[in-house]
């Protein structure tokens, strides 16, 4: 679910926590070896309710991913607005090629440019581990 954070930050952060779970503490991150991802460049968003058009935007929109207990979260800024995408693992599909990383959530399709391939592969492994562990515990 894509949320505009600026309107009501407290309520929107609470909604993100309800969907994907709370962010891990530093200790939990060390134990689970979950440090999120490296930076990605957001290239496009298909079918979003905020009508974000990155093709006509001159600045670079960067983001990184946070793996949580129930799902994935990422934040980005576009034209002085902060947005968050939060989705449970069961509704996420991904595709990855040499330089492009595509994530389809429950409502939107995102294309990212991969900046660091080695870190990207490590993140994909962590994502699959979290997704599979979630399925095993259910």
What label would you give each PLM region?
Residues 40-60:
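A low-complexity, Ser/Thr/Gly/Pro-enriched, surface-exposed linker/loop concept
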């Amino acid at each position: 679910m894509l949320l505009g954070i600026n309107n009501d930050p407290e309520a929107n952060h609470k909604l993100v926590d309800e969907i994907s779970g709370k962010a891990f503490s530093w200790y939990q991150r060390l134990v689970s070896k979950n440090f999120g991802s490296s930076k990605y460049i957001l290239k496009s968003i298909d079918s979003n309710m905020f009508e974000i058009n990155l093709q006509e935007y001159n600045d670079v929109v960067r983001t990184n991913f946070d793996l949580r207990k129930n799902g994935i979260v990422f934040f980005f800024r576009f034209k002085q607005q902060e947005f968050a995408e939060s989705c449970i693992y069961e509704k996420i599909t991904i595709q990855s090629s040499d330089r492009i990383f595509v994530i389809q959530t429950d409502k939107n399709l995102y294309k990212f440019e991969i900046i660091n391939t080695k870190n990207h592969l490590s993140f994909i492994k962590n994502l699959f581990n979290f997704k599979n562990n979630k399925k095993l515990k259910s």
